[in-house]
Regions:
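Dinucleotide-binding Rossmann-like beta1-alpha1 core, especially the glycine-rich loop
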Residues: 49-124, 134, 253-254
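N-terminal Rossmann-like FAD-binding beta1-loop-alpha1 element of flavoenzymes
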Residues: 5-32
Length: 366
């Protein structure tokens, strides 16, 4: 006999919890199913914990819109709930005159997304960060950092206070739309029937979608796993802001981020791997970090970088093998399965966008 429930959210990362919160605060009955032993153990626990301002994302994209909306919501939420965070700011730096044009392009693009940046010449940037080497920089005052675990605790508390439930060790075996409801079979044989199901399973979202009977596989993108390695600094860094090199074709470059204790870490790089469980950091990869970091911090000492941790970006690709660069929020209007919303490719800025994503999904299923 199936147990009836209004809404099921599969995945208790920061986005799944934000979706569950948005639904619960609207009076919906919510059950969150998490395969792991607790919430937020994968992508949500292995990132830079940066609150992004929204500089780089294509204008009109979900990433651009939800990042800007989510950033405002996140700062307000953290202040209201006393969640540790800091609006420390970020400098995007050009380390050669040839990069000035690229830096100007970043400034213009950010402005198109509604994000104002301050142009700094060498001396102005050095006045903010004396150890920095650059020819020019952009100052993003609205970039910050957040304690992602404390954030998820707050979101979960909101869900539970509104009557929602988190069930851990609850992997989903398959789903099917039948008898005017989404039927969910857990690995332990539990059978649930739900009006609304949100697939917020992160790295596992495409695989879960393929186990959803009645959902045409043409709607499921191909996952690929982009590992990002981080190296931590032995000792204190002489910086109080995040430092990012000017973006190049290969990505955002090896950037310096800080945690709330002031500890510096560098990364992430990009390493394509076959499995999302490949989380060991190869110390040899650190050698490539030194040359990149010294472009903007010549004072980095030999031997100062230590292997930190790694995360996996949930990249997705279309049937032709082209990268899908925007968030995919796929509701019944896209795939035709009533009551089902799939979230694919929720990589950065997923943490920043989480509260806005929750609101967006709640509106789709209203």
């Amino acid at each position: 006999m199936a147990e009836q429930v209004d809404c099921v959210v599969v995945g208790a990362g920061v986005v799944g919890l934000a979706v569950a919160r948005a639904l619960a605060l609207r009076g919906r009955e919510v059950l969150v199913l998490e395969a792991a032993h607790t919430f937020g153990t994968r992508t949500s626990a292995r990132n830079s914990e940066v609150i992004h301002a929204g500089l780089y994302y294509p204008q009109g994209s979900l990433k651009a819109r939800l990042c800007v909306q989510g950033r405002a919501l996140l700062y307000a939420y953290c202040a209201e709930r006393a969640i540790p965070h800091q609006r420390c700011g970020k400098l995007v730096v050009a380390t050669a005159d040839a990069q000035r044009e690229s830096l100007r392009a970043v400034q213009a693009h950010a402005l198109g997304n509604g994000v104002a940046l301050q142009w700094l010449e060498h001396d102005e940037a050095r006045a903010l960060e004396p150890a920095l080497e650059c020819v020019a920089a952009l100052h993003s005052p609205d970039t910050g950092i957040v304690d992602s675990h404390a954030l998820m605790l707050g979101l979960l508390a909101d869900v539970e206070q509104a009557g929602g439930i988190l069930a851990v060790n609850s992997a989903v075996a398959l789903m099917e739309y039948a008898q005017s409801a989404m039927n969910i079979i857990a690995n332990d044989g539990t059978h649930l029937q739900a009006t609304t199901v949100v697939n917020a399973a992160g790295l596992a979202a495409p695989a879960l979608a393929l186990r959803t009977q009645g959902l045409d596989a043409v709607h499921v993108p191909q996952p690929r796993y982009a590992k990002g390695n981080y190296f931590t600094l032995a000792g204190r860094a002489p910086f109080s802001r995040l430092i990012y090199p000017v973006p190049e074709a290969a990505g955002l470059g090896v950037h310096l981020t800080l945690d709330l204790g002031g500890q510096a870490r560098f990364g992430p790089d990009v390493q394509w791997v076959e499995t999302p469980d490949d989380l060991a950091v190869d110390p040899a990869r650190g050698q490539a970090f030194y040359a990149e970091v010294r472009k903007y911090w010549p004072g980095l000492r030999d031997g100062a970088l230590e292997p930190g941790y790694a995360g996996i970006r949930p990249k997705v690709f279309d049937a032709q093998g082209a990268a899908i660069t925007d968030f995919v929020v796929q509701g019944p209007a896209a795939h035709g399965v009533p009551g089902l919303v799939n979230l694919f490719g929720i990589e950065s800025p997923g943490l920043t966008s989480a509260l806005a994503l929750g609101e967006h999904v709640a509106q789709i299923v209203a």
